[in-house]
């Protein structure tokens, strides 16, 4: 699921780079912990609220592109937040506990936000959780 969001961001940024006129805003949403079962549950719940059997589609399930991916880190079957965030932001897997470096822990990798900023875009990052 994490690569899905990276794919969507990559496609959006690519389209923005080659489209005329240039996109004014690009949003990259990350549904942490959200998989197919969570989406299906939400759609089933929304349909039930309307007294229907079946699903009521969420808007993002209607996007023209989607992908299914593996979400393990470079060294573990279960990804932690550091490795997951690095993969989402940079497109590179790393070791659990590592942030913005490859699994060798020496080679830095840069986020799509940094690339956008270098390209002249204004960048903002928001979260719904505290940074501990």
Go through each PLM region and give its residues:
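Sec-dependent N-terminal signal peptides
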Residues: 4-13
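N-terminal catalytic scaffold of extracellular/periplasmic and nuclease hydrolases
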Residues: 20-132
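Sec/Tat signal peptide C-region and signal peptidase I cleavage site
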Residues: 15-19
């Amino acid at each position: 699921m994490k690569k899905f969001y990276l794919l969507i961001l990559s496609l959006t940024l690519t389209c923005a780079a080659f489209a005329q006129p240039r996109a004014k805003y690009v949003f990259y949403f990350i549904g942490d912990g959200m998989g197919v079962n969570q989406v299906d549950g939400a759609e089933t719940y929304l349909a039930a609220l309307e007294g229907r059997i079946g699903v009521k589609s969420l808007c993002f399930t209607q996007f023209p592109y989607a992908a299914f991916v593996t979400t393990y880190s470079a060294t573990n079957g279960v990804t932690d937040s550091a490795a997951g965030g690095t993969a989402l932001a940079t497109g590179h897997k790393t070791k659990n506990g590592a942030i913005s470096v490859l699994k060798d822990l020496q080679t830095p990798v840069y986020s799509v936000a940094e690339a956008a900023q270098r390209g002249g875009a204004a960048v903002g990052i928001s979260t719904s959780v505290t940074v501990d």
